[in-house]
Amino acid sequence: AGIDMICYNFMPVFDWTRSDLAKVLPDGSTVLSYDQALIDKINPDSIADQMNKKAQGSELPGWESERMAQIKELFAIYETVTEEQLFDNLVYFLNKIMPTCEKYGIRMAIHPDDPAWPVFGLPRIINSEANITKLLEAVPNPLNGITFCTGSLGSNPENDLISTIYAVKGRIHFAHLRNIKYHGYQKFDEASHLSSDGSLDMVAIIKALRDSGFDGIIRPDHGRQIW
């Protein structure tokens, strides 16, 4: 009983980012979509208002109103923070909490940055196999692990998801299975979970998780809104 795993992220100022929360597909379903060219046209100070407006009255996780009310101040705070400094802060945080995690058997499962590249100049540090491996080596306690989100890491087609699964085997505590479809450089839609509907080989990903000894929790992630 109780909490034995925490999925969290270390993305400063705001969480995941999309340019469209309800892109209409030919079959009438809607999906979350990202287009860097559209993001580049948005004033960072107003992105919270635009995201919440698109949410049609719902409060989006990672875009909570109390946090977004301070977005200008947060941007100012992180304006001079480098990726190296953010990484050092993450390592410091994890080292400080590991004794408590050991006492209560809590696995920490960091979620990759979404998308897997810097947005509005903010540092992003959990976005590739190299960066994930770097963190796991810096804090080698097996309770320090990751949430393997195929859609977040897979947003960058240069990320080899199968390779990453084997590179960090034993440290994947949570898996988010999400398919995406590429439409060009830093441009993608979220897709249904069938491999044929997107750009990710979901069957191969699940097989790699099984073959690498994964015994954590899997959650089907996002997909389409069909009603």
Positions of predicted regions on the chain:
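Active-site acidic/histidine proton-transfer and metal-coordination neighborhood
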Residues: A1-G145
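Histidine-acidic metal/acid-base catalytic patches
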Residues: A1-D4, K72-A76, V91-N95, P99-K103, ...
